[in-house]
């Protein structure tokens, strides 16, 4: 097989043109084998002798290559620019290690990446071994330290999916976190007296709250009236009569003197003011029985008793008025005992002013006409129900819907209600509520409807 020329015959090449080629030492290969775009094919280094090429290339810096020429490199300036090429150890060039991160300790594989052999027809066959693409061995301690440094410098704001979309991890729920309080508008409470149900509180008639049940009372509405000194003294406790009677049911324990207990005047006053009024009255009466000569009554006691009785009458009248107002309000809300007019009758629909749906009106028309055809139904509706003059289309649609739903049965031009139940107390009306709650029996026609009423009969299941 003749050798194939890859270059034009008229073009000459210089010795420095070896930069773009890869030379081979074969006897039958006088020209280098070049691949596309100046990429040199990899050849077997065991069959390659670079000494004649280097000696005849005119480059004085490069000496003859030794057996370890693939381990040494040097930088050479050529007309095509600077390049790095193998150099012999005898030329004085130093070994250039591969570029690497100084923080990483790397041990590279120094074996050739591939080996190629020639076939009988002159073609080059490349054979690769499993250890050609060998991964460099890193020092694990140094590598882990470098990864930690990279993680510290790299801050991820959000994760990315395979499609490149950013996602963010949801925030974990913290049950101990304080919830944000919603801003709410403060509403002033309207205080109403428990007796008169009024909220005004003038200076002469203040509203006072009970310290027992927290019920509000006007000074003059409560019985007995509340003293002004109690209102002015903020620290003083006041209980309404209901709370006082409730507390008075508990027995009062006595039997000790103030000297035995070592009580001061303030302690005595504080204890006696905390007692309910009935208990205080019992104590005073007990003291009066023991010492009848004690001057504890007011000279104007008779007049004061008259005023107290008058206030009792006024307060009782106020209570009666408030009770009557509440009773009347409840009676107005309660339904009356008079029977309400029966709805869905002709007179009720005509006079009540309430307009019902078309199915209800059609039932009324059928009940109140002798031969309820469509024209008779429309005439009855026009005379007894306040409808618009153009109600015929809507009424016709309602009749058709009732026939399809089985609520009406058509016998020729006559329509009848599909029910056999009668309500004597509601004649001639039919309540739709009863119709909805009751199951309407299904109608199975024996024959198809015709104009002849006798040709249509229905069987009630």
From Swiss-Prot:
One GO CC annotation: nucleus
Signal peptide limits: none
A GO molecular-function descriptor: DNA binding
UniProt xrefs under SUPFAM superfamilies: FYVE/PHD zinc finger
Bias (Polar residues) ranges: 102-119
UniProt-listed InterPro entries: Zinc_finger_PHD-type_CS (IPR019786), Znf_FYVE_PHD (IPR011011), Znf_PHD (IPR001965), Znf_PHD-finger (IPR019787), Znf_RING/FYVE/PHD (IPR013083)
Superkingdom, natural source: Eukaryota
UniProt subcellular location: Nucleus
Gene3D superfamilies, per database record: Zinc/RING finger domain, C3HC4 (zinc finger) (3.30.40.10)
Residue ranges of the region described as Disordered: 79-130
Residue intervals of every PHD-type zinc finger in the record: 190-246
Any single GO BP term: heterochromatin boundary formation
Alphabetically ordered keywords of this record: Chromatin regulator, Metal-binding, Nucleus, Transcription, Transcription regulation, Zinc, Zinc-finger
Subunit structure: Component of the SWM histone demethylase complex composed of at least lsd1, lsd2, phf1 and phf2.
Summary of the function given for this chain in its UniProt record: Component of the SWM histone demethylase complex that specifically demethylates H3K9me2, a specific tag for epigenetic transcriptional activation, thereby acting as a corepressor. Has a role in regulating heterochromatin propagation and euchromatic transcription.
PANTHER family named in the record: HOMEOBOX DOMAIN-CONTAINING PROTEIN, POLYCOMB-LIKE TRANSCRIPTION FACTOR
Name of the featured protein: SWM histone demethylase complex subunit phf1
Species this protein is from: Schizosaccharomyces pombe (strain 972 / ATCC 24843) (Fission yeast)
Gene name tied to this protein: phf1
């Amino acid at each position: 097989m003749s050798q194939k020329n890859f270059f034009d015959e008229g073009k000459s090449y210089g010795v420095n043109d070896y930069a773009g080629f890869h030379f081979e030492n074969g006897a039958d290969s006088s020209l280098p084998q070049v691949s596309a775009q100046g990429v040199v094919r990899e050849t077997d280094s065991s069959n390659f002798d670079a000494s004649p090429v280097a000696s005849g290339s005119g480059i004085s810096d490069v000496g003859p290559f030794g057996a370890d020429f693939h381990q040494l490199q040097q930088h050479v300036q050529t007309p095509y620019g600077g390049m790095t090429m193998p150099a012999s150890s005898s030329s004085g060039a130093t070994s250039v290690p591969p570029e690497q991160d100084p923080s990483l300790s790397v041990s590279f594989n120094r074996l050739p990446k591939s080996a190629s052999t020639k076939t009988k027809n002159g073609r080059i066959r490349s054979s690769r071994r499993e250890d050609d693409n060998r991964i460099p061995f890193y020092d694990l301690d140094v590598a882990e330290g470098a990864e930690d440094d990279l993680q510290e410098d790299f801050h991820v704001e959000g994760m990315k999916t395979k499609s490149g979309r950013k996602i963010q991890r949801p925030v974990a729920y913290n049950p101990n976190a304080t919830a944000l309080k919603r801003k709410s508008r403060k509403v002033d409470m309207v205080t109403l007296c428990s007796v008169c149900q009024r909220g005004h509180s003038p200076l002469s008639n203040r509203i006072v709250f009970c310290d027992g049940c927290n019920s509000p009372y006007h000074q003059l509405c409560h019985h007995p009236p509340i003293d002004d000194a109690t209102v002015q003294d903020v620290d003083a406790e006041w209980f309404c009569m209901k709370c006082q009677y409730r507390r008075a049911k508990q027995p009062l324990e006595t039997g000790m003197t103030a000297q035995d207990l070592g009580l001061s005047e303030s302690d005595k006053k504080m204890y006696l003011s905390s007692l309910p009024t009935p208990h205080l009255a019992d104590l005073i009466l007990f003291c009066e029985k023991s010492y009848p000569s004690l001057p504890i009554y007011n000279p104007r006691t008779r007049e004061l008793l008259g005023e107290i009785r008058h206030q009792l009458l006024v307060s009782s009248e106020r209570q009666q008025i408030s009770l009557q107002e509440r009773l009347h309000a409840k009676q107005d809300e309660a339904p009356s005992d008079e029977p309400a007019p029966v709805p869905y009758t002709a007179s009720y629909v005509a006079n009540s002013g309430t307009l019902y749906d078309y199915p209800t009106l059609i039932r009324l028309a059928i009940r109140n006409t002798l031969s309820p055809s469509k024209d008779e139904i429309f005439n009855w509706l026009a005379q007894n129900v306040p409808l618009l003059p153009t109600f015929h289309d809507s009424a016709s649609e309602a009749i058709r819907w009732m026939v399809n739903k089985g609520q009406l049965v058509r016998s020729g031009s006559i329509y009848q209600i599909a029910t056999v139940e009668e309500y004597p107390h509601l004649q001639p009306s039919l309540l739709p509520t009863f119709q909805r709650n009751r199951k309407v029996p299904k109608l199975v026609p024996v024959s198809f409807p015709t104009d002849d009423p006798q040709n249509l009969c229905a069987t009630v299941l």
